[in-house]
């Protein structure tokens, strides 16, 4: 009879470059072999334990939670969780070991163990080949700590000395009075993963497989072996002992009890009463004329459900964070599903008035869905750290931490790691990387490999690609989530291990953001949004120069001039609708009101595009197609002309037409979002179809709805999310239209952000007749600023003065000292500037080269001469007479100034580079962007321009969109996949690009369909012009 067995020492791929199999693969194989349980014991981490728990549930095979540990100057052991007490003890041990070491490492000391270590079982893995006395000492120390909860692990892997090793281990166990147990040191689910495991070992140790030597296992026996194979190596009683240990380990992750912090509640209040009071206060501000009956009913419904689900403290915490931001003059706005909530609006978390929208609260919280809400709040991108540190101060690092993201291997990165350890030279690795797609994880086809000069049948290449395919999708390391916070009433280390983040002053839990819902932890996302920084700076500038303090809430709505500007696609620099695809859509959709912007934000997304929703909507909007939908679904489809554009509409259709409950509809939403990655949508096909047919809907309508639903698997927008973003879109457009100087100035001061570089933003401002003044130490602060025009008109009475931040390599500290010194008296010459502002030679030379000393000293050549040799500290020589030898230096040429501008500032206020080349280009019959406005459709022609952006959306079937800029404006170029592949080097490498192609002009949108590309970069003669590619 084959013995029963439980594997107590097994590493998954969440051991990061050790285990060569996923938890799912391990549990499926162990279940197939008839194991009684499986322990996942990744080294000093529980990063993969939630996924292991899910794999355990799906297979029915019990999970034992544990971790392999190396104690500094001590033994190696596997710690297994017996009870909740033991789980908390293990989390604390991992936390303390990780927190005292730098990221990616740990240091576990003997003194970290509690005297009793209750709830933890230990399997000692002795080094019997090493120092015998040290080995005995390790065993005695463990026996003192764990007593009857300690075993000696016997691990045999078909070595030549297995028989002797078994005898020695059993003798050691007997001499110390420690029972023995069989374990496998499993690193893979099947022997076939040995090559991958060897590869990962070499990657981890920064060596090649050929040179890894003893670092590699001697054979492939560290896999989940069948029971009969185990019985050949181990005595039955050793195998049976593993099952007895497994039966002691009864802890399950569902036993975790998570509580949100309570300290935000004043004395005499409960979380429920305090949330209601804050909501009522906010409601009086939001609705000064009182709530309508419908809104009052919605608020009451939400408060009741929040209390029922015990989420009161969560809402109070988010409110507290938002209130802190506002007290610090940090602009913020909630978005996503939280925008469905009237309570969130009343609390000031979101800005979307539910009375003016038709949003679905069940998208946010559902009685039937046993999971927490997810509130995302955007903050100014350059001030978010203040909010993050406030949370750490408010709750302490023991109770607040950021969530992790399990960064996984992707195609090119996986190949590079594999190829390197297999010994390929760097030039071949770089060339092979070119054959990998930037936009998918699929391996290159043999045809593509041949295009890049590789023989697809070469054994080494086949091996590289095979191992790369296995490695893709494996966890590579834990990184920090952009802003997802977990905050707890009790120390987080009792729930999950905490470790140091790569960034200073930050800590992260070991669980991925996707794990949190499964174990019931609530997360609040503290996200960064550059446009909020730009809007707040714009509001400040307008207040400074106009005396008017605007807010997001009180900007004039439905402004005709703003919508006319939007419909012309005059949207460079604004939020969301500045991309190449959005600007092409705007003249076709021609937004006239806020809800049109909501649709515009949502419609240029992979979901609606792949669900074939864009063209039907446009045809119906332009009265080219009849608007049809079942009368019962009028409330769902009327606002989008019968075309489902939002996730909420799909949920409403499922509820009304197919009989889904709100909770079931939310499950459908989740399936929509994840079906391409995890499947799970097909079961809904029949459910939807049957329900819709039963309720009298046509079969073709049901089928069409399902196909559109599948499109949402490619990032369809929730309406609440689109509406939140549309608020910022409108605000940025209104400011661009009515306060263009302030808006452009704020954008540059908030950079890096958005789609365009400062140079492109300034070129656009100049095309809008905004005066741009150069960097000048007599007037410039660190930030760009606004100055009155000498002869102001009624509308454009402010100019932009470029700030010292524009000077490449110039430090903010130096700029602040210039501001301070200048406030006392004006600078008289270079020596006065350098001495009083404490500038070193490098800083003074940067100012001279950039032209910032032109007003003080003269042109660049003169300024460079003047600052040469001037030092910041010359106290011994201050009173000595100086010899001032005047040197006559030639003025820079226009071309020299242009090159120096781009080299030092990244922009120019002189002529556009293309203006200097226009005569040369015109002689070759090149057209300008201005010419294209009057040329007829289908004309073939050539244009040339600076490449300011390249995009290749995932929904574009390999099409690359290129934006060129000349002295008059921009040209949009479409490069089909075959041409992009043939001329990849020219397409990706050119700064100045010539395109020969066919002009396509439809509905006010003009593109040039490329037929041939030419690199004209040599004509720029070293000009440093940088594009913003694939943003």
From Swiss-Prot:
InterPro entries: DNA_pol3_alpha_NTPase_dom, DNA_pol3_finger, DnaE2, DnaE2/DnaE/PolC, DNAPol_HHH, NA-bd_OB_tRNA, PHP_dom, Pol/His_phosphatase_N
Enzyme class at the top of the EC tree: transferase
Keyword entries, A-Z: Cytoplasm, DNA damage, DNA repair, DNA replication, DNA-directed DNA polymerase, Nucleotidyltransferase, Transferase
Domain of life: Bacteria
UniProt key word Cytoplasm: yes
E.C. no: 2.7.7.7
Catalytic activity field: DNA(n) + a 2'-deoxyribonucleoside 5'-triphosphate = DNA(n+1) + diphosphate
Gene Ontology terms: cellular component: cytoplasm
GO terms for biological process, alphabetical: DNA repair; DNA replication
Molecular function in Gene Ontology: 3'-5' exonuclease activity; DNA-directed DNA polymerase activity; nucleic acid binding
Primary subcellular site in the record, as a coarse category: cytoplasm
Pfam families the UniProt entry points to: DNA_pol3_alpha (PF07733), DNA_pol3_finger (PF17657), HHH_6 (PF14579), PHP (PF02811), tRNA_anti-codon (PF01336)
Cell compartments where the protein resides: Cytoplasm
Functional summary from the UniProt entry: DNA polymerase involved in damage-induced mutagenesis and translesion synthesis (TLS). It is not the major replicative DNA polymerase.
NCBIfam families per record: polc (TIGR00594), PRK05672.1 (NF004225)
Record family assignment: Belongs to the DNA polymerase type-C family. DnaE2 subfamily.
Full protein name: Error-prone DNA polymerase
